[in-house]
A protein has these predicted regions:
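Active-site neighborhoods and metal-handling regions in enzymes and metal-associated proteins
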Residues: 1-352
Length: 352
């Protein structure tokens, strides 16, 4: 589906909801609908050509990249957009995300226009990937798997966490990653019990758990994967925790398919960990959508009301975090289909 087709699909949804226009401020949303990576703001009217508003330094790049959008530049893209909107017959306009100050400026400038939150509808459209998007994510996952291989080969007692991260980052760049999908995590020892432990200059100790969470970017699309290793020989306790998380992952993955409520997938993993005595140490949801953003819809949470559908790309990442002991997380990016989900990140899940 090209950007123009996405705009038309969005417009049909807007018409059903009585919207005359849609304001986009988030870079990922602007790229999804326009094809440009350099958008500041975008306006999609139902009955006029969509417009991309940028600063002067981004104008030429936006002009070259944008598909089906007029491109305008100025010192203040928001004011320029508001001037254009004042000349349109708009009664109800949606937005994806606005700061409070921008929302106040919008309401003051367009007093007769009703402004409504339309973020969920925008993300609902983005949640189902077309073949081109899947191909980009698949490549980002291939690159991430190479990064994990480099991390594994570098990781040993005495090596600093940041050195492991550097090796993985270099490998992914050499394979064609545009940037890390998110700040990489290499958390060792007791730090592995921090879900977002980042990476430090800490030297990895012998026999310690090491959580490595990384992702690559290709054509703007992200990947996300986590492995947990032991620097040396694993203890019985470490193996016990790791096997529990692996079973939770495997059981949950069996449930990742078209039509299954997202909460059921989360609860499948949660029940495994509860049965094994680790339920209270699983402190986040099971997964999230992946695309132009590394965290998007659908959300695999016990509180979710969403259903998985064919074309969703999600993570499956059960974990156990025990303060003072360490953590184990296993994660793949997977593609939802009619049958068993396809794992797009493929590096082995071996503990050692």
């Amino acid at each position: 589906m090209n950007p123009t087709a996405r705009v038309e699909k969005m417009r049909r949804t807007m018409e059903e909801d009585g919207l005359d226009g849609l304001i986009l401020t988030q870079p990922e949303n602007i790229r999804y609908f326009s094809g440009s990576s350099r958008g500041g703001l975008a306006l999609i009217p139902v009955e006029a050509s969509p417009i991309l508003y940028v600063y002067r330094l981004d104008y030429q790049m936006a002009l070259d990249e944008a598909v089906g959008f007029r491109v305008k530049y100025g010192r203040n893209p928001l004011k320029k957009m508001l001037r254009d909107m004042a000349g349109m017959k708009l009664r109800k306009v949606g937005f994806d995300q606005l700061t409070l100050s921008a929302y106040n400026v919008l309401n003051k400038a367009l007093k007769r226009v009703k402004v409504v939150d339309y973020n969920r509808k925008v993300h609902g459209l983005r949640a189902v990937k077309d073949e081109e998007e899947v191909s980009y994510i698949r490549e980002a996952c291939r690159i991430a798997s190479k990064g994990m291989e480099a991390a594994y080969e570098t990781l040993k007692p005495g090596v600093r966490e940041c050195e492991v991260a550097a090796a993985a980052c270099r490998a992914m760049r050499m394979e064609g990653s545009e940037e890390d999908a998110f700040p990489m995590i290499v958390a060792s020892g007791v730090r592995s019990a921090y879900p977002h432990g980042g990476c430090t200059r800490r030297r990895i100790g012998r026999g310690e758990l090491v959580v490595v969470d990384l992702g690559a970017t290709y054509m703007g699309y992200r990947s996300d994967m986590t492995r947990t290793f032991v620097a040396g020989e694993a203890s019985d306790r470490q193996v016990e925790v790791w096997e529990a998380v692996l079973e939770a992952y495997s059981k949950a993955l069996e449930n990742v398919r078209d039509g299954v409520p997202a909460r059921e997938v989360d609860l499948t993993a949660r029940h495994v960990l509860e049965r094994r005595g680790f339920g209270r140490f699983f402190i986040h949801s099971l997964g999230h959508g992946v695309g132009l953003s590394v965290h998007e819809h659908p959300v695999l949470s016990r509180y979710s009301r969403e259903k998985l559908v064919k074309g969703n790309v999600v993570t499956c990442e059960p974990a156990v975090y025990i303060h003072g002991f360490g953590g184990v997380r296993l994660e793949n990016t997977v593609l939802v289909s009619d049958g068993r989900a396809e794992e797009l990140t493929v590096f082995p899940m071996d503990l050692l």
